[in-house]
Curated annotation (Swiss-Prot):
Transmembrane feature ranges: 9-29
Gene: psaJ
UniProt-recorded name of the protein: Photosystem I reaction center subunit IX
Chief place where the protein resides: membrane
The protein's role, per its UniProt record: May help in the organization of the PsaE and PsaF subunits.
Cellular compartments annotated: Cellular thylakoid membrane
UniProt-listed InterPro entries: PSI_PsaJ, PSI_PsaJ_sf
Highest rank taxon of the organism: Bacteria
Record-stated family: Belongs to the PsaJ family.
NCBIfam families: PRK02733.1
Length: 44
């Protein structure tokens, strides 16, 4: 399993970018689920 992380294709830019975007989207979704009013301010 750990040899997988040292392979060349896993460290390529599309794979790293996809993992980064998925993690960022997941963090935003979970943040908005627990604290729904901090991301969108309808009064502004």
């Amino acid at each position: 399993m750990f040899k997988l992380f040292s392979t060349k294709w896993f460290r390529s830019a599309p794979v790293v970018a996809t993992i980064w975007i998925v993690l960022t989207a997941g963090i935003l979704v979970e943040w908005n689920r627990f604290v729904p009013d901090l991301l969108f301010h309808p009064g502004l």
